[in-house]
Amino acid sequence: MHRAGPLVLLFTLVVLSALPAAGATAAVMTYIHHAPESSLDVRYEYHWEILRTALEVTTPKWGPYRMVVSEPMTEQRQAYELKNHTGKLTVMYVSTTPDFEKNLIPIHIPVDKNLGGYCVFLIRKDDQRRFDSLRTLNDLHKLSFGLGLGWIDVDILKASGFRVVTGSDYEGLFAMLVQKRFDLFLRAATEVLDEYDNRKEALPALHIEDSILFYYPLPMYFWFPKTAEGRRLAARAEEGMRMMIADGTYDRIFDRYQRHKIERLRLKRRRIFRIPNPNVGPETPFADKRLWFDPSTYK
């Protein structure tokens, strides 16, 4: 039987001392996000996969994590929970505002590459010919836009003089459109196909307008509470997202979720209308072209 010499034993002890003691576990970093607003609400699947992947690739450095689904919440409610450090949420996904920049911790990487800033209209099927004739922003100003109560887009559109009708219930907005409470339901290119496909049988009057692309810069970020733990959660997620951008993982996930939407909506062929977003500040990373989708150059 061979016995280890003194140097081998010493080396073994040094290595073992660097490892966690048996049964010891690292503190689990917990990311709590809101639940979908209905069984048909799949708007956030891509964004949570981006976050989950960022946490996976940083596990060797940061240790274990878990993602917890809380209750359904409006954007207003999510912001309240984060700003007041209630513990009911530790992360939300929403567009930038000066208030959020001041009172929360953002990761300044547009999660959807600003694809959500390219919008199309859900309309009533019989109205398509009316929309075909629209050629200027003044033409669009004659229409009423449907949006959710408290959505950041409401103030953006009102700042450009558009007439906005709001509804407090996400599912109810689709019915409001069909009932002619407003002329169009403004939807992000990231959302509209799933919304239409999941509701077209129940609401056969729904139609995706097929000629217009409505754009404003809308960087959608992950936001965290302004606490020590919030800073840790944000630092880990940002590190993972930047690793994904560098090795191409980010683009691959984006393409898997978004390419068919970009192609099916024919974004390159639509006539585009642009308005400014007064919420966008100097911290917006416009200079890094890797972070921004452009339909004219997307391949």
Identify the residue ranges that each predicted region occupies:
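Bacterial N-terminal signal peptides
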Residues: 8-18
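Extracytoplasmic small-molecule ligand-binding "clamshell" domains
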Residues: 26-102
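Bilobed "Venus flytrap"/periplasmic-binding protein-like clamshell domains
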Residues: 40-55, 121-161, 173, 190
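Short helices/loops that flank or line small-molecule/ion binding pockets
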Residues: 68-90, 159-160, 171-190
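Acidic, polar ligand-binding/catalytic clefts
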Residues: 70-140
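Short beta-strand->loop
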Residues: 105-115, 201-216, 264-271
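A bilobed periplasmic-binding-protein/Venus flytrap-type ligand-binding module shared by bacterial periplasmic
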Residues: 119-135, 217-235
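An extracytoplasmic/periplasmic, membrane-proximal ligand-sensing/linker region
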Residues: 240-299
